[in-house]
């Protein structure tokens, strides 16, 4: 089966409310400008050099196309820190470029415990990522935020996003 990085990310699943507003929008704290804090989405894979940066790049473009940059922020991280500070894999960037996505200069970083609290939605690429994220949440207070990436895909029947770094 052939995979592309341009997986369809249906915004209506992530933002089901009218006008595309995030589900937690009404509950977010207000800032000094009387506007809600942005809804924060974190994409997570093993090393943060292929799948999660690709998801972040695609998602940011989709958010911008919807005019929601002021309401939605995203980031990506890896379960391991081996590639900390490294740019995304060049093969992944080449694949994204074929679909019209630009390299924004991302650098790999590991997931931090505080990410579980700071992000409104944490999207894991595979079962191992989901398991490890839930283990990081020792008290189980953030597990409702942790969801699989394939929850949002419609083109592929898979339950996880294969890791292309290792030939997936």
What are the residue ranges of the model-derived segments?
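Phosphate-binding/catalytic loops
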Residues: 38, 121, 127-168
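Conserved active-site segments centered on acidic
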Residues: 25-26, 31-118
